[in-house]
Amino acid sequence: MRIAIIDLGTNSLRFDVYDVYDDEEFSLIHREKFMIRLGDDVFTTGQISDKVMDRAMETFDLIKIYIKEMKIKETFAYATSAMRTADNAKKFIKKVRKKIDVD
């Protein structure tokens, strides 16, 4: 089975794709890093700015294409402190979930 893991950090988004085998072995088949700078305004204003949100959504548009073309079955995401701190994190998560099917 092919899975993707999205690591949404304060400065970058890392997108990794793995093939996972029945014997619980796995292999990394794709790794990409995008500089979306999610935390640019979060630590000063408490909000993910519209500009940063738009930049992130452009990245998720590309990730959506990767998910389809690479035949990824499941996508998992986790985020670091910028997302936990942002007052509008729920809005951001809702927009991401509209773009891609993610847990």
Name the predicted role of every residue range.
Residues N11:
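Primarily the dimerization/phosphotransfer
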